[in-house]
Amino acid sequence: GSLPSFPQATTTFSTPKFISIEGKISNEKVKLTWNISENETADKFEVEKSSDGGNFSLAALVFGTDKMSSDQYQFYEKVNSGKILYRIKLINKNKELEYSKIIEINAGA
C-alpha cells in the first residue's frame, strides 16, 4: 500500500509595518508618535537618535503590545538645542527588522 497524502500546511506570518511616524517639540521635550499595522507580530521598537545623520545610538526601548491589528506608540525625551534626527527600528517576533523614515527635530538655540 501507499501512504495517505495530506495537504501541506503553510503558515503565513504577517509582518508589522509603519503606517505613520511624526515628531514634535514642545516645552523642550520631543514627542515621537508612530502607528503600525499587524501590531500583534511586533516584538519591540528601538528608538535611535543621531546628531549627524550617520551614527545612530539607542535612545529608548519600547516593547510592543499584544493588541490585534494596529496600535500607536509614543516616546518623550527632554532635549537641549540643536538638530536631532530620530528613527525607529521595528523588530518583529521573527527577529526581522524594519526602519522608519528619519524624523528631524530642530530644538531652539
Q: What positions do the PLM features span?
A:
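Short, compositionally biased serine/threonine- and acidic-rich segments at solvent-exposed termini, linkers
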Residues: 1-109
